[in-house]
Amino acid sequence: MDLSLLKNLSAARILVVGDVMLDRYWYGDSGRISPEAPVPVVKVSKLEDKAGGAANVAKNIARLDGKVGLLGLIGEDEGGQILEGILEGEKINSQLVSVCDLPTISKMRVISRHQQVVRLDLEETFTEQHSQLLLNRLELVLDEYDFIVFSDYNKGSLSLIENMISLAKKAGKTVLVDPKSSDLHLYRGADYITPNLNEFKLAGGQTDSEEGLATSARKLISDAGIKAMLLTRSEQGMSLISATEKYDFAAQELEVSDVTGAGDTVIATLAVMLGAGMTPKNAVEIANLAAGIAVSKLGAATVSPEELSRKLGQYLHATGEHYQTPFDDVLQHIEFAKQNGETIVFTNGCFDILHAGHVRYLAQAKARGDRLVVGLNNDASISRLKGADRPINPLDERAMVLSALSSVDWVIPFGSADENDTPAKLIEQISPDILVKGGDYTVEQIAGAEHVLLHGGKVEVLEFLDGCSTSKVISKIKQ
């Protein structure tokens, strides 16, 4: 995965078209039953309004730093005014079209003790005449965008979606659709559709086996003239299916608080990552991580680049890929962690043959803060320090082993004869909050200590485990 593309999220120029909604939340305590009917009485203590539907897709894109526009229909009412006010506070080029004869789609949820008690929907279905207003506006703004996302909640805004997709494809745009209709032919020409499992079944998809699922998905997209399907499968994760390939992505193991808007997060993240230049497979990997974050929050939630960066770091750690992360990307991840208020700890060493002393030492170092960065001497550096017969294990293998430890967040190679094989320059680049060194050093003897102290950090010396050293391990093996 090319993590450098995460710096390029603002390159995505995305237009969201579809059913915009106002999500309203009324929070309160429910300690008694109504004397009028056998229903709970909720004493409302807090009101909250959020952008929903297609507006939530646009909000997700904006929060990921994508350049986004929004087309949708609202009524000439209070709900429309509130929704426009919410969107004004976001980095969204909002172009909502007001109609006088129908209300703004609004969903009011009563929440008590983290549970939804009831939902009230205020809506009427928009007609083709209303949809024509969006089609006309789409034609005017199409040249400003590279990706077009259609968010279909079957509320009528996209009654003319076939015409809209045709218009977008003729203009050379990449089209993504979050579908609601079971007739996938309505989305002919789309590059990606993102149905959930229930929508897939209603469209004729088979789920009895993985082979049957893939076969039926390929038939559906082939018949409908669609390039690929990203099937969201709840606890089974996601599957990206095209005519020749199928990639499966496991669901993220997080506590699910609310699945509201999870599909919005998926298609928004997919569009942003594709716009940044990622491959479809990598873009879906990131979208899967974003969905895991979103469902752990209450309500239609968004995901920030910082949250995504942290989750990506955990994911790469779990898959054993993070030791291969380019240096500039590691620095960016560290900076995100700092912005989130996390304490960065740094230590360094050769770690030629990992032993119990190393493991305990690294765990103690990690306990000093939130994230641990390990500077790892490269092979040439170790040879200069330890002799021509060292290292025993090459850099890549040492980095892989260290990266498998839960205490280690990032491994960064270093070592230059010009710098006396110390990590001083690396420490200046990272500027950790805490610098840890093992052994009987004084603070004055520790490379990089002066920089850390000068910038308000701390320096600590930890004791090594008696009887544990790489030299002793090598000696014992030779015996």
From Swiss-Prot:
Region named Ribokinase: 1-319
One annotated GO biological process: ADP-L-glycero-beta-D-manno-heptose biosynthetic process
Residues the record lists as binding ATP: N196, L197, N198, E199
Alphabetized UniProt keyword annotations: ATP-binding, Carbohydrate metabolism, Kinase, Multifunctional enzyme, Nucleotide-binding, Nucleotidyltransferase, Transferase
Source species, domain of life: Bacteria
GO MF annotation terms: ATP binding; heptose 7-phosphate kinase activity; heptose-1-phosphate adenylyltransferase activity; phosphotransferase activity, alcohol group as acceptor
Enzyme class: transferase
Region (Cytidylyltransferase): 346-479
SUPFAM superfamilies named in the record: Nucleotidylyl transferase, Ribokinase-like
Keyword Nucleus in annotation: no
Any one GO CC term of the record: cytosol
EC number: 2.7.1.167, 2.7.7.70
Pathway: Nucleotide-sugar biosynthesis; ADP-L-glycero-beta-D-manno-heptose biosynthesis; ADP-L-glycero-beta-D-manno-heptose from D-glycero-beta-D-manno-heptose 7-phosphate: step 1/4; Nucleotide-sugar biosynthesis; ADP-L-glycero-beta-D-manno-heptose biosynthesis; ADP-L-glycero-beta-D-manno-heptose from D-glycero-beta-D-manno-heptose 7-phosphate: step 3/4
Catalytic reactions of this protein: D-glycero-beta-D-manno-heptose 7-phosphate + ATP = D-glycero-beta-D-manno-heptose 1,7-bisphosphate + ADP + H(+); D-glycero-beta-D-manno-heptose 1-phosphate + ATP + H(+) = ADP-D-glycero-beta-D-manno-heptose + diphosphate
Active site per UniProt: D264
Assembly notes: Homodimer.
Biological role stated in the UniProt entry: Catalyzes the ADP transfer from ATP to D-glycero-beta-D-manno-heptose 1-phosphate, yielding ADP-D-glycero-beta-D-manno-heptose.
PANTHER family named among the record's database cross-references: BIFUNCTIONAL PROTEIN HLDE
Family: In the N-terminal section; belongs to the carbohydrate kinase PfkB family. In the C-terminal section; belongs to the cytidylyltransferase family.
Entry protein name: Bifunctional protein HldE
Gene (name only): hldE
